[in-house]
């Protein structure tokens, strides 16, 4: 579920300079506090030796116990970055290349998660219906409804407005869910459709996929770090959002799967042509080989 910037991780060419993590950091219900043993088992024992910054996002499985605990892991884990539930970092890749990393918390923006129907949002599934075999009862729903998705959208629009509009800087947006699933506020029309957003990376679906929304092929699923499952694309998706008067308005976004592969793997993103192009490659981790790529120009 990790996306790597600038280089191949396993191949040994051009080692990466940073990692973008699309969420679900600690299965099944997240961590209880900063002393939770899962931190060592699922992260530090596996990745702490990589020696590069990790820009982390929250997934739905991080919402069961304490999402806030992950915001302070930087105090004990070198390289762990999660400034807030959603945040922006401006990163100098080189003297001439700047990348704006906008990390969203898409979880409170999925309308199914805000309902009272537990079957739509239980992060532990049928095996652990309330997470009690692991630790304590799941607090997923109360954690979700405590967040304001509309406020996050206004924040994201403000961040984008602060970035130069001359395409001199790259903008990478990271979220846990596929673009069409972020439906309790209109992130698609009001934010992601903006041409200043060059790439959107998500996890959640446990596969690799390149897809387009509203004709823009700048979207990818890089959720194949583990528990690989079958994923599907869609030709169109209709989303309904209640307005402030309780009425529902219909939004239709054309979603098309361009390429997908059900395989354990990751993506790499390499700056080329003097920083004017980024090549995204999808990697089969078992074969240690690139299986698909596409280019985006600034």
Name the predicted role of every residue range.
Residues 276-280:
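Hydrophobic residues embedded in beta-strands of well-ordered beta-sheets
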Residues 1-35:
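N-terminal active-site segment of His-dependent metallophosphoesterases
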Residues 173-180, 200-208:
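Histidine-centered catalytic micro-motifs
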Residues 281-291:
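Short, solvent-exposed aromatic-acidic interface loops
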Residues 160-181:
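Short acidic, glycine-rich surface-loop motifs adjacent to enzyme active sites
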Residues 17-19, 169-171, 198:
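Conserved acidic residues
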Residues 27-165, 187-199, 205-270:
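Extended active-site neighborhood of metal-dependent phosphoesterases/phosphodiesterases
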